Amino acid sequence: WIMGHMVNKIEQINEFLDLGANSIEVDIAFDELGYPEYTYHGVPCDCKRYCTKSEKIDDFIEALSAATTPGNPKFRKELTLVVFDLKTGGFDASRMYKSGKAFAELIQFSYWKGSDDAGRAYIVLSLPKLDHYEFIKAFREHFDTSTFKNLLEERVGYDFSGNEDMGLTRVVLNKAGVNDREHVWQGDGITNCILRSLDRVKAAVAIRDSATGYINKVCFWTIQAYSSVRDALNAEVDGIMTNEPGVIANVLKEDAFKDRFRLATYRDNPWETFKR
């Protein structure tokens, strides 16, 4: 998956897809009560990027639903996976559960439109800290009594992006109601302004490939240097988050990689662990 980073304006959806992405990452900002309010990253962000692009949440989710609904004039078949980078650090932790419920309602009614046929992209809920796990728990429990529980079970995955201890990550996911290998992505990375080693990525890949692991997929962020992309692919990641999708697309065409990797399509399940 080539994951377009910090896609927070409606027009950026097509912009990043046209550059070669098949996935996007969207930053979700919340009000002081934990209700989703805007798409917004804020300062600081990545080098050579504008950090303050924003849309009202309802407008963006409406456009995202259109872009991922077959038959809609704005449908883009390339967009198969959406990572919601949930900025849950801006409100009191006591509101985490209610915030998760509110976001579940937004997805059910504004993205899926209360239908099996709208908003077909797979979704990853990415939280910045392990102690925010009640957001995931609430999101999942919202669908316990819903006729759309099948969509939760088919289309939603989970990630913690804070580069915290992976053994503890497993424990916390279980506390949130997520079983081992139940749609679990493990991200690792840092802003593109700083070089980061692949040590933690390789550790995550080893857990993914272990018979007793809890991870389905591993993502590295945020890179765009050709050498960094090659190193990440050689580490066997499943996704790369980037500001320049064309770089990853070009590397995938190189002799060293063209027979080992291909761009994921909608037929590729982002919850299945790939085995060579």
UniProtKB/Swiss-Prot annotation:
Keyword annotations from UniProtKB, A to Z: Cytolysis, Dermonecrotic toxin, Disulfide bond, Hemolysis, Lipid degradation, Lipid metabolism, Lyase, Magnesium, Metal-binding, Secreted, Toxin
Tissue expression summary: Expressed by the venom gland.
Cofactor(s) required for function per UniProt: Mg(2+)
Disulfide linkage: C45-C51, C47-C193
Recorded coiled-coil stretches: none
Functional summary from the UniProt entry: Dermonecrotic toxins cleave the phosphodiester linkage between the phosphate and headgroup of certain phospholipids (sphingolipid and lysolipid substrates), forming an alcohol (often choline) and a cyclic phosphate. This toxin acts on sphingomyelin (SM). It may also act on ceramide phosphoethanolamine (CPE), lysophosphatidylcholine (LPC) and lysophosphatidylethanolamine (LPE), but not on lysophosphatidylserine (LPS), and lysophosphatidylglycerol (LPG). It acts by transphosphatidylation, releasing exclusively cyclic phosphate products as second products.
Protein name: Dermonecrotic toxin LlSicTox-alphaIV2i
Organism (species): Loxosceles laeta (South American recluse spider)
Organismal lineage: Eukaryota, Metazoa, Ecdysozoa, Arthropoda, Chelicerata
